[in-house]
A protein has these predicted regions:
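Conserved P-loop NTPase nucleotide-binding/switch module
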Residues: 1
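Conserved phosphoryl-transfer catalytic core
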Residues: 5-9
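C-terminal-of-GTPase-core extension/linker across diverse P-loop GTPases
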Residues: 14-219, 226, 231-233
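Intrinsic-disorder/low-complexity regions
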Residues: 223, 236-239
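Hydrophobic alpha-helical signal peptides and transmembrane signal-/tail-anchor segments
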Residues: 238-246
Length: 246
């Protein structure tokens, strides 16, 4: 907050000179003054009620406390499910910022991470009445906060996950594997995650009509299992095509 307050003060000084003749600078100055008052009260900019236009006006100020955050409360084993008075205080504070709080016991999480056998992990978590490691919730919340999602490519040798931004279309999603996949994108074979889990294999999904052919406008969904077809011109002026199976 102190860093942002310093940045806002400097920006206000510049805008005051420009605001006399520049309407945009005048708008920015008004928003910056709101931000200064808010920061002086010990509050973060992300908790300030600003319109989309207001936030656009101060976008180039790159204020740290405007960025969304997530809090992680490390508690003891006895408090891992219910939290304690300290994590409750954190939750209350986070409400004002619209932020999420993940309550977890790092000691337990470390022990889970050391167990390589899935059966051993299941037994260990059952002893602590855990359905899944808290680390899973942490990762999922971080992805949500950063507006990210995952799709998969599944082949005989391995299954791989790829991270993309929400709202990306199939060609953009393909580009994280290789830029040629976006340039020469033809189509994508898509299986929904739930269908892949239910039918266990690509062949079974195909037999049950759960494999779809999607084009360039397809919006990739979180968990999609995808194969890409593309066609590009190489340096020898010849075409090569590929159906990706990783």
């Amino acid at each position: 907050q102190l860093k942002d307050l310093d940045s806002v003060d400097k920006k206000i000084q510049r805008c005051e000179k420009m605001a006399k003749t520049d309407p945009k600078a005048k708008v920015e100055l008004e928003v910056l003054q709101k931000c200064k008052t808010h920061l002086e009260q010990g509050k973060s900019i992300r908790s300030l009620d600003l319109s989309k236009e207001d936030r656009t006006a101060i976008a180039d100020s790159f204020l740290l406390t405007e960025k969304p955050v997530m809090y992680v409360a490390n508690v003891d084993e006895a408090s891992m499910h219910t939290g304690n008075k300290f994590s409750a205080m954190l939750v209350e504070m986070a409400k004002n910022e619209g932020a999420e709080v993940i309550v977890m016991c790092n000691n337990i999480e470390a022990q889970i991470a050391e167990l390589e056998d899935p059966a051993d992990k299941a037994v260990f978590m059952d002893e602590y009445q855990m359905k899944e490691p808290a680390l899973n919730r942490l990762i999922q919340s971080a992805y949500k906060l950063l507006n990210l999602e995952t799709y998969f490519t599944a082949g005989v040798q391995e299954v791989r996950s790829w991270t993309i931004e929400k709202g990306w279309k199939a060609p953009q999603a393909a580009s994280v594997i290789h830029t040629d996949f976006e340039k020469g994108f033809i189509k994508a074979e898509v299986i929904a995650f739930e269908d892949f889990i239910k039918y266990k294999s690509e062949a079974a999904c195909r037999d049950n009509g759960k494999l779809r052919i999607e084009g360039k406008e397809y919006l990739v969904k979180d968990g999609d299992v995808m194969h890409f077809r593309f066609n590009v011109l190489n340096s020898s002026n010849t075409y090569y095509s590929l159906l990706l199976f990783l």
